[in-house]
Amino acid sequence: MTAKLNSVIINPSVAHTATVIFLHGLGDSGQGWSFMANTWSNFKHIKWIFPNAPSIPVTVNNGMKMPAWYDIYSFADMKREDENGILRSAGQLHELIDAELALGIPSDRILIGGFSQGCMVSLYAGLTYPKRLAGIMGHSGFLPLASKFPSALSRVAKEIPILLTYMTEDPIVPSVLSSASAKYLINNLQLKCLDRPFEGDAHSLSSESFMAMYKFTQTVIGSP
């Protein structure tokens, strides 16, 4: 059992029939993404969970502690990965999913996702979770620990819709990594992944990517 995550939770205003679990990026918090629930208030049946990453030493932050799902050794070489940290955080996300199942929410009514680091953890966790999820959505990320696939892929992963959005000139997570991951998911792993690049040079969520995520949420769990 891994350490339990502290989360910002926004409960539905009607009967709870679906859940979204969304992970923030490096140095952020669950509160920083809770605006999604307020902006998408028409999804009255959805419970929103925005977990807070633990504060850990981060190499690119001169070893100082900050909220992070795993260590980042270098922004210049993002393929050098903190495997233990990624696996630990993916396990914590699995436990959050398990907790929703225990409340009676079917796995195919649980949508997971995230931004940057949160996107990467969500991709790994979703593709390795043993039950079929409603979907996986992420912005400004790529598939971590890619060498573990396809062997790490769950037997139901090919049934899970995936949305990967990113900015074409992202200064932190190069779009070439996001694009390559999307192509790998589609062509090599034969997964149902939507590859959605948007013009822009910021490491942030654009209005276009936000709308794409809204439409994706509407498609996979929008109906009560």
Swiss-Prot record:
Keywords: Cytoplasm, Fatty acid metabolism, Hydrolase, Lipid metabolism, Nucleus, Serine esterase. It catalyses: S-hexadecanoyl-L-cysteinyl-[protein] + H2O = L-cysteinyl-[protein] + hexadecanoate + H(+). One of its GO terms (biological process) is fatty acid metabolic process. The active site is at 116 (charge relay system), 170 (charge relay system), 203 (charge relay system). The keyword Nucleus applies. It is an enzyme of class 3 (hydrolase). Hydrolyzes fatty acids from S-acylated cysteine residues in proteins with a strong preference for palmitoylated G-alpha proteins over other acyl substrates. Mediates the deacylation of G-alpha proteins such as GPA1 in vivo, but has weak or no activity toward palmitoylated Ras proteins. Has weak lysophospholipase activity in vitro; however such activity may not exist in vivo. This is Acyl-protein thioesterase 1.
